[in-house]
């Protein structure tokens, strides 16, 4: 029998610590098995992490993000890369999450160290595919990431 998993401060501290130690500045803690139809995870995020603008094209790949600790900025883009909406997502704030339909370009900026979000989307896991990464933004590891990430963060100054 599977046991309940609690989203408590001990888990938050563990995931935040692993995110801080990660070269990518983020860490996933899965509550699901990879073959389950619903993927649920806590994601620890540090300001250094780069989550490039992307979308999920499969009709069943909508996702919901809820901030459990800290502050994130979410940017919604049109097909050409213009920001059409943005919002600060903050645990205990006016807006703590977003439900993103499939096909919507979005990117995240971590505005507070040791932030943690809960993410839910349909499984199974599938890497971002052709046409899902924004053609107008650098990919993780490419030249220009630092400048683009600074621009993304500046949208919340």
Q: What does each model-found stretch correspond to?
A:
Residues 42-43, 62-67, 98, 108:
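His/acidic/aromatic-lined binding-pocket segments of jelly-roll/cupin-type domains
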